[in-house]
């Protein structure tokens, strides 16, 4: 028996495209978003079931984002066509992320800063500290890794951060680091490092605008929380 079901064969209230139109793209699950890309299932399952299994096999979005052609083809029901669709989607995502790192990206609020680095930092298995260098109009000049490892005020030296800022004629900076646990609650050391960098910035005339902590798809702004 051929059980292949297209999205259009599903009840209307279960169709991802109709849900997108009615409620917005944000309302769709990861499975439904992937289903819109792949469009059809196979002889034994519909596209929703197939996409659920793909994400489960890959270990979620993180695994899918890092999957290669061979790994995708090893998933039952994924042939050359569907593997190519997924790889094209992943490549577009990577290129878009790279595009956003350019100097045409303007930061007007903490959300802008968080979204600039979110997709890269949310999956990291250890802590990274990045500095976003800004010009006088808050356009991004550069995003630079300055430290890898747990933040500690005795290890993280402001010199490394402001050296990059001075080299790139930065007017102000935003620092961002990730919590691999996904919990964005700032630690005592996070706060100490922020204050130390802020004070050093005052001395040399380069303002620290914010410290953004990245979790798994969420963030916290120390500025918004009145911690900085």
UniProtKB/Swiss-Prot annotation:
CDD domains, sorted: MPN_DUF2466
BP GO annotations: proteolysis
Keywords recorded for this protein, A-Z: Hydrolase, Metal-binding, Metalloprotease, Protease, Zinc
Name under which the protein is recorded: UPF0758 protein CTC_02075
GO molecular function: metal ion binding; metallopeptidase activity
Transmembrane segments: none
Family note: Belongs to the UPF0758 family.
Binding-site list for Zn(2+): 177, 179, 190
Coiled coil: none
Placement of sequence motif JAMM motif: 177-190
Classification via PROSITE patterns: MPN (PS50249), UPF0758 (PS01302)
Highest taxon listed in the record's lineage: Bacteria
Domain MPN: 106-228
């Amino acid at each position: 028996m051929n059980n292949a079901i297209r999205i259009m064969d599903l009840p209307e209230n279960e169709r991802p495209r109709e849900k997108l139109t009615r409620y917005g793209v944000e309302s769709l699950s990861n499975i439904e978003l992937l289903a819109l890309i792949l469009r059809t299932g196979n002889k034994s399952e519909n596209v929703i079931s197939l996409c659920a299994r793909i994400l489960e096999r890959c270990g979620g979005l993180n695994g899918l984002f890092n999957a290669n052609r061979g790994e995708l083809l090893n998933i039952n029901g994924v042939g050359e066509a569907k593997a190519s669709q997924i790889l094209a989607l992943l490549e577009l995502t990577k290129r878009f992320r790279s595009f956003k790192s350019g100097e045409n990206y303007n930061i007007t609020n903490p959300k802008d800063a968080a979204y600039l680095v979110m997709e890269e930092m949310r999956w990291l298995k250890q802590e990274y500290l990045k500095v976003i260098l800004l010009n006088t109009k808050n356009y991004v000049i550069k995003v630079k890794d300055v430290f890898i490892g747990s933040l500690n005020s005795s290890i993280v030296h402001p010199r490394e951060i402001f050296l990059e800022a001075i080299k790139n004629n930065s007017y102000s900076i935003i620092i961002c680091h990730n919590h691999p646990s996904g919990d964005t609650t700032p630690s005592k050391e996070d706060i100490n490092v922020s204050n130390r960098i802020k004070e050093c910035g005052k001395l040399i005339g380069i303002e620290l605008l914010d410290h953004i902590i990245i979790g798994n798809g969420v963030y916290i702004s120390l500025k918004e929380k009145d911690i900085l």
